């Protein structure tokens, strides 16, 4: 990819092709030994806790501060690091947005240098092309694995930092729009469910609780067979 087909006005330079490792100061994965669950303490993030582009703290568990302190830095991502699920559920990404977080071996940590913003890298790795490449390169039998030794050798397309920022802003705005419309859709679905309960008689009642103006007669109770013909296929 030298240049994208659609581009913001004012940008004409070729995009650079770089191995992902050229844009990283660190790529690793988390702890392998079991760690205890606690009621409070540092967050313990596994692949199942990365969903819809974010860390899902409602499913994540805590671990003890003592065990967290004993971990090496490779298991303790910093705010702004990119997480990538590498075992089981593959290719999901999230940017670390809290301190005192640790990851297990099902999650890779990618720390980007000045050549590539983490937000741009996340947007890029979420595209169908790079998702497919990571899945195609995955190994294993029943449970698939993404190998970080293959991930960091992937070639990625890197524009200048200002264009990276424009792209990130554009797709963030689209995500916000999707979220807004999804919320409205959920509200309409809830309204429909509510009205289905209120606009049909319940528990052998003769009239529904909510009704269109001008209709007052009781509803008739009939067997379905009186109204339709039922045939076996």
Which residue ranges define each predicted feature?
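Short amphipathic coiled-coil heptad-repeat segments
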Residues: 1-12, 183-217
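A short glycine-rich beta-alpha junction/loop motif
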Residues: 2, 86, 101-108, 139-163
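Proline-centric
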Residues: 9-14, 109-118, 149-168
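Non-catalytic DNA-recognition/assembly elements of restriction-modification systems
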Residues: 9-29, 211-233
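DNA target-recognition patches
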Residues: 21-25, 34-67, 102, 225-228
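A short beta-sheet element
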Residues: 46-48, 57-130
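Secondary-structure capping and domain/repeat boundary segments
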Residues: 73, 118-159, 200
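Extracellular/lumenal glycan-associated surfaces
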Residues: 163-177, 181-183, 220-222, 226
């Amino acid at each position: 990819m030298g240049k994208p087909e659609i581009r913001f006005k004012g940008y004409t330079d070729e995009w650079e092709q770089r191995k992902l490792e050229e844009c990283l100061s660190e790529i690793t994965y988390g702890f392998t030994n079991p760690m205890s669950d606690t009621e409070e303490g540092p967050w313990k993030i596994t692949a199942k806790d990365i969903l819809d582009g974010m860390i899902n703290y409602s499913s994540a568990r805590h671990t003890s501060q003592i065990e967290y302190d004993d971990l090496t830095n490779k298991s303790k991502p910093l705010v702004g690091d990119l997480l990538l699920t590498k075992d089981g559920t593959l290719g999901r990404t999230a940017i670390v947005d809290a301190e005192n977080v640790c990851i297990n071996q099902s999650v890779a940590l990618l720390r980007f240098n000045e050549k590539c913003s983490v937000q741009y890298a996340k947007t890029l790795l979420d595209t169908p092309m790079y998702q497919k490449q990571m899945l195609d390169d995955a190994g294993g039998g029943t449970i698939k694995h993404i190998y970080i030794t293959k991930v960091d050798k992937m070639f990625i397309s890197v524009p200048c930092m200002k264009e990276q920022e424009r792209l990130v802003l554009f797709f963030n705005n689209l995500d916000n729009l999707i979220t807004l419309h999804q919320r409205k859709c959920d509200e309409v679905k809830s309204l429909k469910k509510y009205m289905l309960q209120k606009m049909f008689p319940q528990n052998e009642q003769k009239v529904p609780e909510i009704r269109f103006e001008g209709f007052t007669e009781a509803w008739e109770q009939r067997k379905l067979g009186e109204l339709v013909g039922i045939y076996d296929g």
